[in-house]
Amino acid sequence: MEVTARGDVPKTLQTIAFVSIPESADLEFLLWDLQDAIAAYARLSGTSLPRLVALETDDGGSAADGIVFAVEDALNNEAMSVVEQALDCLGGTETRVYVVVQADCESPERAHTVVGHLREACERRGLSWCGGIVVCAGSGIAALRHSPRMGLLRRPFSEAMDKLVGAVRMGCSIEHAQRLGGGNAENLGTDGMVFAEPAVPAPIWNLSMRK
């Protein structure tokens, strides 16, 4: 399975943007978890973090080297228009584009549709689509913010998130990062996505989300 060729060439990201569409507690939590993990791995390895940029206010004259979108699987036309406006701000074709999709546990098909639209939007602009993760947790995952990251409830999502962390740190697609790191890239979806589902039965998971 091939992704955009540039995404298979590692690149140290000097600047990065994190964009949540729409703004919600769940998407904010997922981006927080990603950024926290990136920072933790940077501390452990003694490497520097990419500088955060806000696309709508960045006046430094340089586009972001990488961008991570956090979106819902029910991305409507208005939200997709906001995504495309953000992509138009990137300018250069060297930008690596990643995505975190919050999806319904029962209907992962919608996530496939959203990912397909996002990838097409990147390809139309010549941007490097680098895949991402689909968090099949439904709504309410922000309730796990204070749960152990590798505990029973968060572990499947944390393991998927760590694959995204590795790709962002390498500045390449998740698939290529997995191959470079000796991991298994065979379980990736056709769009370079990692799907993560709860490790507990649905009734227990749903009860946990109501707390």
Spans of model-derived segments:
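Short, charged N-terminal beta->alpha structural module
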Residues: 12-47
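Glycine-rich phosphate/pyrophosphate-binding loop and the adjoining helix
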Residues: 133, 137-211
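Hydrophobic, Leu/Ile/Phe/Ala-enriched alpha-helical segments that form helix-helix packing faces
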Residues: 34-46, 86-90, 118-126, 161-169
